[in-house]
């Protein structure tokens, strides 16, 4: 007999029992319980009568589980005993599962053949005539063996026999599930989703009926998930039923037939007649409550279906579970069920599912990786799309793939379209219109904005939008409406009805448009141009979005929009033009425009070419009017009904003289007149705009005054920036939150400013005439940001008598303030800037105790303010992250400076009196000491080091010509050790990425690369052969260095980097390329230095980088596949990415970094490269032995152009130790 595993067996359960004892009681009940759970159990009645032992043994061999019911007379039957021997043979050879049940017999009696199990063997020749002694011995051994298998015991007096039968049946079902192949191999991601779903089902709760709704868009896998759960769990219930595809089946055969099927299945009664369906649940309540049920209602789309089929929870036994799959989450909310929103596949799962279908593998073929990514981007984790497209593209060439992907940009795949369209067909007419409008025109827009636009004739569509969300056709993300790309493509196809109409046949559309039963939405530029130039509009056209970016200039008739009486959305724009750019007029209306539809709710026309809007246009339905960069001189010359208007944007309409006609815009919320340079005044009726929230008058340079008191109480944002003719600030609403007055010529703020209780941002930057601030400034309790930079006549800052606990940003650069007030209660200040003051300003106020001062200060800018000393207690600024002291007269830093443990960015540029630097904070990432021309000495170490070092850092000492040799050696040595500690720490964390920025970078004035760089060359490029086993497990990175010659270089961009392009070449001439940065500077936008950086001499730039990328290519083996490396260096301004020609790399060098070896560590200690001071206090948290344990010098071939470089000593194995 061939052995086989239980999982490959054909049948479920074989029952071995003594019929005389248990056929009509225990075994009969057990077989029924198994059958109820869909388990095929075999009883050998027929085979006994035919005495067909061979067929019986064949059935035993092909069963997954054998259940043996030992009863009083079991051992009296030779047939049973032969079954038992065969079962145990299969257990040994096929790993068949065996479950013994000791039915009212003692387990030890079976094992030792005592009592009723001893009787048959006392006179075997009488009990078993013709049976050999050898076979009888095998029976005894089988009884003894079987009795030692874990099983069930039914005692003589048992009141819970029925419960035990159910327990055995459930356990058998579980065992069969464990034995069977999962069937989920192709169902990627199913296990994690099953796990999440089971948490909601609360299996342990046996007192409550739980209803769970699996919700998701069509094709996302709801039915598949429910089916997997049903197959796995149904055996644990007394009854179960899976009603598939209720949406379709209820229409075909009716709900009554589905209810009949449900009841007959869960009650296990094929002949059941439910009678009148109205009260069927009540009639069968007793029977329903007698069983724990598992019911799945699949693809439900109507609440009536749930109520009809499920009834009420009170009619079911506690512990029952009802699972509903639906596209409409609102249905689950209505019946108070729990929702499980089925997520799309993540990137890894999507790649696997697609690859299984397209390549019969878990990963794509290498040559199809790019095309595969395009498919994944299209499908966005949708299982149905991934399977359909994978099957379609399987075994196709790349040309077919490219053609298919190109078609998918505008056309759905047929099989996908058919499934998706079912969701659309279920919508009401109003829901369809809203869905198509969103898909064609308003995807990714703010939900409140879209709702306002789509409201038609006073009908609120917010409920419709919610319905579409509930039906999984759209989603809300950050309050914006989104949808799956495939749904949008389907919607556009439905809207165009390309195959039915032939939209490009404009004449047909004009003649037969009245036969169309749908609204037309147009966005194809060619179609729209044909329509407009020939004046063939129809009242079926609902929306036009015309992108002019690819159009040539064209003339339009004055009647271009004639006949489009139901046009609601009109947008003419240039997708290549940013919001602020001046429009190129491509649509010319030489004879003006005689008609615009009165149904317009949305009118956007970037660069509207006319001086006015058609006189006959009635804007009663207009909600959004955007005509930026237009030629308008006025909107309309008389008052019109604009009660629906909410948004108006006429920005950069340089000919606009007045904006009358908005007096009746009682719902207007936003008015943007930015850049309307001809606008001299606003109408007084602006005070009638009771809902106005936002008013932008930026750069209205002719605007001299505002209406007396803009008292509209709703105004939150007022922008007057750049209104250079505005001399007086009027009274405005006290509810304003953002007030921008920068660039105006106002001389003062009104005393009533204190009443602006909600003001959060006040910008007075470059108000050159402003001389004083209100003494009650501190009463602005909500003020978060105050900008006074450039107020050159402002001499006094008022006292802050009470804590302004909301104020976080205070900028006072380039003012005439000579003294700071004694009282400055700013407990929450985070950013303070006082750059460019001419006097000696005291900054002691910033270093108060945490309870009074600025313990939360993170950014402090004090450049060019004549500071000569910092307070000794500066270390108390525990939150400080950025500090700018450039251009001051500081000679040294206080000892407490290294207590600034959160300091990351430190700017000391142009501190020309600074002579030395102490130990700096441990977490410092960026230090810029450019042109500290008196700087001679540096602390050693410059920052504390730790064995687990992780802080990347860049130290710039350009133009520090007095930096002595010890300081340079200390800087280089510190950078070396820090970088190796970091690289080693990364290796220990099993980091396998590649960081394009340096672990440590430094720059200082010098003409030579340090001698321990064993690979050096003149010029900007370097090529070296790599020694065998160079990339062993201890390799951690590269050290790179260059000398850059500057020829009167001036860095106006404040960005500069030395870059390297590296190539590691394989034996087969293939190579791996990567780019990274050695060192440089990139001044943050918060840097307020006015001086540009000038360099005229040679400087050394050095960078250390972890380079695990080369390991990724060939793994961790000691056999390195790279045999040659080359490096090319260049400099760039980091803004334009162009190389700087006035800077030249004249020398370059490279060394390899490794985890240390013992002999290297000892030698490094002896050479004493860097004297690591251990007397820097508690912040210097490392021991020299610890450092040496983690540091090993660079090694490699000691090569130099023209011979060995002095200072490099060659070791036997061609590895060197740096001295």
Swiss-Prot record:
Q: Which SMART domains does this UniProt record tie to the protein?
A: TIR (SM00255)
Q: Which residues form the active site?
A: 83
GO biological process terms held by the UniProt record: defense response to bacterium; plant-type hypersensitive response; signal transduction
Instruction: Please report a single Pfam family linked to this protein.
Output: WHD_ROQ1
| MF term (GO), any | ADP binding
Q: Which residues form the TIR domain?
A: 9-176
First and last residues of every LRR repeat: 468-493, 538-563, 597-619, 620-642, 665-689, 690-713, 733-757, 759-780, 804-827, 854-877, 878-899
Q: Which of this chain's residues are annotated to bind ATP?
A: 216-222
Name the EC number(s): 3.2.2.6
- Does the keyword field hold Cell inner membrane? no
Q: Which reaction does it catalyse?
A: NAD(+) + H2O = ADP-D-ribose + nicotinamide + H(+)
The chain positions of domain NB-ARC read: 197-446
Its domain of life? Eukaryota
Q: Per UniProt, which keywords does this protein have?
A: ATP-binding, Hydrolase, Hypersensitive response, Leucine-rich repeat, NAD, Nucleotide-binding, Plant defense, Repeat
Q: Regarding domains, what does the record say? A: The TIR domain mediates NAD(+) hydrolase (NADase) activity. Self-association of TIR domains is required for NADase activity.
What the entry lists under PANTHER family is as follows: DISEASE RESISTANCE-LIKE PROTEIN DSC1 (PTHR11017:SF576), LEUCINE-RICH REPEAT-CONTAINING PROTEIN (PTHR11017)
Question: Which family is this protein grouped under?
Answer: Belongs to the disease resistance NB-LRR family.
The function of this protein is:
TIR-NB-LRR receptor-like protein involved in plant defense. Acts as a trigger of hypersensitive response (HR). Functions as a guard of CAMTA3, a negative regulator of immunity, during pathogen infection.
Record text on subunit structure and interactions: Interacts with CAMTA3 and DSC2.
Q: What name does this protein carry?
A: Disease resistance-like protein DSC1
Q: Which organism is it from?
A: Arabidopsis thaliana
